[in-house]
Amino acid sequence: MTDFFHVILTKPLLNLLIWLYNVIPGQDIGLAIIALTILIRLLLYPSFQKSLKSQKHLQDIQPELDEIRARHKDDKEAQTKAIMEFYQKNKINPFSSCLPLLIQLPILIALYQVFLRGLSGNIAGDLYGFVPDPGSINTNFFGLANLANPNPIFAVLAGGFQFIQSRMMMSRNQPGAQGMANVMNKQMMYFMPVLTGIIAFRLPAGLALYWVVTTLFAIGQQYYIMKKG
């Protein structure tokens, strides 16, 4: 299973990263990571758009869900049944907003391996025939930070932009909504950025840079889709 995952995801991403590193002027692995991140975000845009619209729809109907919960507050079974019927009637999948996260998880795992290999220069055995081996990899991002090592600045940026993205979604909530989902979202708005920062602080800065760029891209997409919607 590990070999299969390596062949179908890790190896292609590694080759794409090294190809970008070779063709982008200056041979800066940071620029290659940014370019790779943008390509991945463009590829995931359809699922992100669908998820965001579904999440916005769920927020729009939150008052009706709160009303159903209040109506059946003494009968949890009837409450659950009424909510599921409401979802079916309005053609809502409450779990569809999790799709981008489920897609991103294997990509993140693969990228962790990609950056470990790419930033260490241990790549020769994994390169396709048409991707030249660049030899040593320049891991200094504009000469300011070594992306092969953890960097507290990138960790703080990763957590900070994660908070901004979460805050943008919370701002779409109906005023006064107090449903369970809304309470959990508020908790996650603070928990996830802290967790992201802690994890990023322990990983190579290249992975933190990926998370910073992908979150910035998501914020832009989110703003565009919400404005359009």
Describe these PLM feature segments.
Residues 1-229:
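Helix-loop-helix
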